[in-house]
């Protein structure tokens, strides 16, 4: 159960939804302009290309909107909250143990594990870059304060190059991370973890 003051954000950015919708409108507009031209030859082909393109963007917008609703932490679907709570329920760290959340994003999983393991220290690491610009170390720290967890800290880190000695943590957990690392051997990344 999370505080109403915490802001865990959504893994589907509103900017992405807006960009897809703008692409839909642009393709629809070009299709409309092309449709007003005299028909025949390349103009008909161009019309169909932009009609199909606008349909593609419309379907993509609907699909991404459904994902946005599903991954809304505080919304009616609450899939994110169910996933976070489900993972945290399985993380058991011994007293004075250490846990590591790789790719912590907004801190939701690290904070949930810290709340379930109050005698342990939890560290959340993320690279917090342009790809997920709405997430940051500051956001994680504000969320931890809103949830009243004093046993969780956050720092910049990379899932591909973790700078910790082997066996530094009693538990390592993650959520929505490894599939976002392009062009890497997943087994190699998991072994690094």
PLM segments and residue spans:
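A short, conserved alpha-helix within the catalytic core of class I
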Residues: 181-192
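Conserved alpha-helix/loop element of class I SAM-dependent methyltransferases that forms part
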Residues: 78-96
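Conserved SAM-binding loop of SAM-dependent methyltransferases across substrates and taxa
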Residues: 106-118
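Short, small-residue-biased leader/transition segments that mark boundaries at the very start
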Residues: 1-2
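A short acidic, Gly/Pro-enriched loop at the edge of an enzyme's catalytic core
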Residues: 160-171
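Conserved SAM-binding strand-loop segment of SAM-dependent methyltransferases
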Residues: 148-159
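Class I SAM-dependent methyltransferase Rossmann-like catalytic core
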Residues: 12-18, 62-83
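Conserved class I S-adenosyl-L-methionine
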Residues: 95-105, 123
């Amino acid at each position: 159960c999370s505080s109403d003051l915490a802001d865990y954000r959504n893994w589907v950015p509103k900017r992405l939804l807006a960009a897809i919708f703008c692409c839909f409108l642009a393709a629809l507009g070009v299709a409309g302009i092309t449709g007003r031209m005299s028909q025949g030859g390349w103009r008909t082909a161009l019309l169909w290309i932009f009609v199909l393109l606008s349909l593609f963007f419309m379907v993509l917008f609907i699909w991404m909107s459904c994902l946005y609703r599903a991954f809304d932490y505080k919304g009616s679907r609450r899939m994110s909250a169910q996933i976070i709570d489900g993972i945290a329920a399985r993380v058991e760290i011994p007293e004075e143990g250490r846990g590591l959340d790789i790719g912590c994003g907004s801190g939701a999983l690290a904070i949930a594990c810290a709340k379930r393991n109050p005698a342990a220290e939890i560290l959340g690491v993320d690279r917090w870059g342009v790809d997920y610009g709405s997430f940051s170390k500051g956001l994680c720290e504000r969320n931890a304060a809103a949830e009243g967890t004093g046993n969780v800290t956050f720092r910049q880190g990379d899932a591909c190059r973790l700078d910790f000695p082997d066996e530094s943590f009693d538990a390592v957990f993650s959520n929505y991370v490894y599939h976002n690392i392009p062009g890497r051997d997943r087994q190699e990344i998991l072994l690094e973890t």
